[in-house]
């Protein structure tokens, strides 16, 4: 009789736990997709890896999706075509203001912040034979690839070069494709904005001789005064082509969620990214900056209630109610 009582209690406990889980998962999708960018870029590696972690731990189907990058991710997440995405705060601010070129005039305000990822440095790669050592001295007519249309590189790097007085021919494409064009001599240089090390740059270093070009002090002064970026040093051990730290500028990247997603779902997806940095570092080394303490780098997006709850309860954050969607 005692045995039967114990079994009954255990069964009741299991039923209670199952009921609680079902209640907590109310409204959860059976599958989800993370908008990343082109293959060969850090967004694709980071977003796909994080999606796999979330899917595995929560028992869902999830994957990264190749997209045009931050601008398109803002549009896709806003419309609910994607649950999650990755963006850069500059393009995010433009999207909220209604100046996203994908949908001019549409304020993409149904996109919420989830967690800080890493900073995106801007730098250039060129064949060593081109002799390009500084951005300001790039010869007129140089053909430069800037990644997919609407990417952070495509949005800001051309404007930076114009501010530095550079005249160039513009090309767009995925990072892997542009890397192949550079090797084949179809373009002269690539202007990158992605978490380091950028897979395409690392691959180029193995296959040919390249120069990785940053910003001089004078160029830094011009760019930081005119664009929403801050000075950033790319460590010398990032690329084989560097003998010393590379002077650059950078913007912060954040993971984003559709604001209508259930609070408990976004809480769990945020927890998985933030509670074990070593696991995220296994996805991509840029996740070294994916730390809860960087929550305060977001001054653009409203926070998803689930993400805000995780940071306020576990990340030492103090996200105010007026910065939380629906708060």
Summary of predicted features, one role per range:
Residues 140-156, 227-299:
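Ligand-binding clefts/hinges and TM-proximal coupling segments of bilobed small-molecule sensing domains
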Residues 29-30, 177, 184, 194-208, ...:
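An extracytoplasmic/periplasmic, membrane-proximal ligand-sensing/linker region
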Residues 89-91, 98-102, 130, 166-261:
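Pocket-lining segment of extracytoplasmic ligand-binding domains
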Residues 78-114:
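N-terminal segment of the mature folded domain
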Residues 29-57, 61-62, 120-184, 278, ...:
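Bilobed "Venus flytrap"/periplasmic-binding protein-like clamshell domains
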Residues 1-8:
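Bacterial N-terminal signal peptides that target proteins for export
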Residues 8-15:
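Bacterial N-terminal signal peptides
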Residues 18-22:
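Sec/Tat signal peptide C-region and signal peptidase I cleavage site
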